[in-house]
């Protein structure tokens, strides 16, 4: 009995006898370990991909943006940059012209495409290869080509590059002809992105859908010709030497521009101010926190389940351990057999866990390559992450086996021979039920008494299932919350005018100008309201947020925002904020804050100004950037009687798309989009995110089923003598099965309750903390639908209640005399 061969043979005998249980527990453990290992690589993948992509295209360190509506002669910004004291810190610089436009094209299947876009006029340069990506365009914020080419010369028509996700979403395949606002056309010869367009920044900011907006990269001189602004720019991008003081250089730039170009308002920002840069890095970090929480919960559920089930399996062998002790065997030798079973489960769990982890890894790798908007995606295998998770998975079953073995070999033989609930000293919490009037007779009360008779076992089973149910609840709740947010935005923006369109003009116009009259008098327009849309900032104390100011028309407007508190702005110094904006700034109706905005100082010249304004009220749109002011407030910006946008309702016989196409060719129009475009873009992004959530929820449900099955199987082994006694006294199979179902049902209800409470808490953290850091502009509505609650009930209560049915075959084939025999 001392040789390893003996123990291996005995271990093999146990494996053949209990292989379904060992494999099932191993699979439970493998699910937790594999998911933790697979999800653990996401942050490193995304950060490495971000670093490589931004580095390959030489992202700017500083950017100088002229105030909206301001344009500077070509070379003026470069001259100012070269005149600063630290000019030698600048290693590369490039001027640009960036303006909104309308894209009209035809998809590969003949479908017309009309969406807003953005002309990005940049310097051209020779193509070069960086990390396997063909890079072209300017030396700063270069264009990385995914397909095609971009040759700015030797072609009769202006050549352009479109965003690849936009082209894929709309079926545009280069070479293709695309028409821009004003009737000009360009030839799309390639698809690519630049650092500032990795995340689409359309009229809805980071919430613009990939297929609803695209930059159009063209040579700088072509952009000047297409937009009617010859020899003009409005943007400068610079790269500094490593280790340079960015803030000092930015201050020098502002002073020099103010000296050389008086009256010109500019904003100097750095890399961290790029919305796409912030989102990509913050999203990688916060998503990993979210995945770590879910992986931890699933791994915790697997750990609780494995610990409980292995412990109960070992304790089911206590009778055999007691017999061995009575025969004089040393406790340490009696411990070898159950520890070997723990080792078997550890090996099975790690092997299957690595397989599951690799499968999850491969799935996520493909998902990142398809959805990550980067020219370089690094998804190499993270062996360290796998080794760490595998080590955890290997230790869990060994520790789970060691605890009951230590307890088993420290008792007297007669105590070890006792089986079932009698091995629990004091009957657990069962005496408490003596003071609780339970309905029914002794048989009807047995399930409840069994649950409290061994509280440690019950708690472990409930916690294991509850932790995994919490993952399903919180993940499903995230989808519900996003959908509720989209629904609220759609309800707000489409009320009273479901077909409403928003027209962006290519510059500021007098409201009585022929250009505005041409748009409002078009046959495609039923009614229209002129308005002024200005980018600005609101500041209260140390808090500052970016907003989009919209003036409200007088009379009977096409659309007005809903007032959730206070009233619509009446005076020029009143603003109506989103509820989320008021919350972030810590203000309410009647309080004051500072408005930082551009103010016209002359044709094509704007300066930055500050105005104290009063909060007139709030509106319920979940996006925090829409801010509304009275029409008279245009004088605050130095633009009385001037407009640059219109809200309109299409003619009765026209659809929204038909009206877009009809308006796109009119002079002065930069873009036309549906009022619901923002919500539609968010819904499109939700579909991409939902695929990840659904897979994790499916894995969680499978793990709950495994926990329920294993718990039932162990219960059947542990209570075999009790069941045999019931059969000996004449109880039918259905009565014994009903007792098992009710007992599991009670634990399922407890697990579901814990899962719902924990899941709602996690959902609150995700919405109010995690998402708030990544997407502060979105006031996500916390929501948990009845469907998600039903899913939790099915995963918890349903799985636990139905699992005992799987033991019917074993109960029918039970040999009652052999089962009741104490010693063979």
Regions flagged by a language model, labelled:
Residues 1-300, 312-315, 331-332, 362, ...:
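Membrane transport/envelope proteins' first extracytoplasmic loop
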Residues 1-35, 330, 339, 427-467, ...:
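N-terminal Sec/SRP start-transfer signal
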Residues 18, 304-344, 707-749:
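Interfacial "coupling" helices/loops that link adjacent transmembrane helices in transporter permeases
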Residues 20-45, 343, 351, 456-481, ...:
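Short, strongly hydrophobic transmembrane alpha-helices
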Residues 60-74, 440-571, 576-579, 588-591, ...:
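Juxtamembrane segments of multi-pass membrane proteins
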Residues 300, 307-310, 319, 343-374, ...:
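Small-residue-rich transmembrane alpha-helices
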Residues 411-427, 812-824:
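Short cytosolic juxtamembrane segments of multi-pass membrane proteins
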Residues 530-531, 644-650, 660-768, 772-781, ...:
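C-terminal transmembrane helical bundles of large multi-pass transporters
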């Amino acid at each position: 009995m001392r040789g390893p061969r003996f123990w291996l043979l005995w271990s093999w005998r146990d494996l053949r006898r209990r292989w379904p249980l060992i494999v099932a527990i191993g699979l439970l453990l493998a699910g937790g370990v594999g998911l933790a290992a697979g999800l653990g690589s996401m942050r490193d993948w995304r950060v490495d991909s971000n670093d490589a992509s931004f580095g390959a295209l030489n992202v700017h360190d500083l950017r100088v943006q002229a105030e909206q509506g301001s344009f500077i002669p070509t070379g003026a910004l470069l001259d100012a940059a070269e005149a600063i004291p630290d000019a030698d810190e600048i290693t590369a610089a490039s001027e640009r012209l960036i303006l909104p436009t309308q894209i009209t094209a035809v998809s590969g299947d003949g479908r017309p495409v009309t969406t807003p876009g953005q002309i990005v006029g940049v310097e051209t340069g020779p193509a070069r290869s960086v990390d396997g990506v063909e890079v072209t365009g300017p030396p700063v914020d270069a264009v990385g080509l995914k397909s095609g080419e971009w040759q700015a010369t030797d072609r009769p028509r202006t050549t352009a590059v479109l965003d690849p996700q936009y082209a894929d979403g709309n079926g545009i395949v280069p070479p293709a002809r695309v028409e821009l606002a004003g009737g000009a056309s360009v030839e799309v010869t390639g698809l690519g992105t630049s650092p500032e367009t990795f995340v689409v920044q359309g009229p809805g900011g980071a919430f613009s859908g990939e297929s609803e907006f695209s930059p159009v990269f063209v040579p700088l001189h072509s952009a000047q010709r297409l937009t009617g602004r010859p020899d003009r720019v409005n943007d400068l991008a610079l790269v500094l030497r490593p280790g340079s003081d960015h803030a000092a250089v930015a201050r020098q730039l502002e002073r020099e521009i103010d000296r050389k170009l008086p009256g010109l308002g500019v904003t100097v920002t750095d890399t961290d101010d790029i919305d796409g840069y912030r989102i990509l890095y913050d999203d990688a970090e916060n998503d990993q926190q979210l995945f770590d929480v879910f992986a931890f919960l699933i791994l915790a559920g697997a750990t609780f389940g494995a610990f409980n089930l292995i412990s109960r399996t070992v304790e089911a062998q206590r009778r055999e351990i007691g017999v061995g002790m009575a025969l004089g065997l040393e406790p340490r030798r009696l411990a070898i057999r159950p520890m070997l079973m723990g080792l078997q489960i550890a090996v099975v769990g790690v092997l299957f866990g690595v397989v599951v982890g690799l499968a999850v890894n491969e799935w996520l790798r493909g998902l990142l390559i398809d959805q990550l908007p980067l020219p370089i995606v690094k998804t190499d295998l993270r062996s360290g992450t796998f080794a760490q998770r595998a080590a955890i998975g290997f230790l869990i079953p060994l520790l789970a086996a060691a605890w009951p073995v230590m307890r088993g070999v420290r008792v007297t033989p007669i105590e070890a021979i006792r089986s079932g609930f009698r091995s629990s000293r004091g009957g657990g919490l069962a005496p408490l039920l003596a003071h609780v009037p339970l309905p029914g007779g002794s048989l009807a009360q047995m399930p409840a008494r069994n649950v409290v008779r061994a509280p440690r076992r019950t708690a472990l089973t409930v916690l294991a299932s509850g932790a995994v149910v919490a993952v399903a609840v919180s993940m499903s709740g995230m989808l519900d919350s996003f959908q509720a947010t989209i629904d609220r935005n759609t309800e707000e923006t489409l009320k009273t005018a479901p077909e409403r369109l928003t027209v962006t003009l290519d510059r500021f116009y007098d409201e009585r100008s022929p250009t505005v009259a041409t748009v409002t008098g078009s046959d495609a327009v039923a009614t229209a309201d002129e308005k002024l849309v200005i980018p600005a900032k609101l500041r209260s104390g140390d808090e500052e947020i970016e907003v989009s100011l919209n003036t409200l028309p007088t009379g009977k407007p096409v659309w007005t925002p809903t007032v959730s508190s206070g009233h619509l702005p009446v005076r020029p110094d009143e603003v109506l904020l989103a509820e989320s904006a008021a919350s972030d700034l810590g203000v309410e109706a009647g309080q004051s804050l500072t408005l930082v905005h551009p103010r016209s100082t002359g044709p094509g010249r704007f300066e930055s100004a500050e105005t104290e304004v009063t909060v007139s009220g709030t509106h319920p749109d979940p996006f925090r950037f829409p801010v509304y002011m009275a029409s008279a407030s245009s004088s605050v910006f130095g633009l009385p009687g001037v407009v640059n946008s219109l809200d309109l309702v299409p003619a009765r016989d026209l659809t929204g798309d038909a009206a877009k196409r009809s308006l796109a060719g009119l002079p002065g129009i930069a873009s036309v989009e549906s009022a619901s475009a923002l919500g539609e873009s968010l819904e499109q992004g939700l579909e991409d995110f939902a695929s990840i959530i659904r897979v994790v929820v499916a894995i969680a449900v499978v793990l709950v089923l495994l926990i329920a099955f294993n718990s039932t199987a162990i219960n059947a082994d542990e209570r075999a003598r009790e069941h045999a006694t019931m059969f000996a006294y004449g109880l039918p199979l259905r009565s014994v099965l009903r007792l098992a179902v009710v007992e599991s049902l009670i634990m399922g209800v407890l697990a579901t309750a814990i899962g719902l409470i924990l899941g709602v808490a996690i959902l609150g953290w995700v919405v109010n903390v995690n998402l708030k850091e990544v997407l502060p502009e979105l006031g996500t509505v916390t929501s948990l639908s009845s469907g998600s609650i039903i899913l939790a009930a099915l995963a918890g209560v349903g799985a636990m209640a139905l699992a005992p049915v799987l033991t019917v075959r074993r109960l029918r084939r039970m040999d009652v005399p052999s089962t009741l025999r104490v010693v063979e």
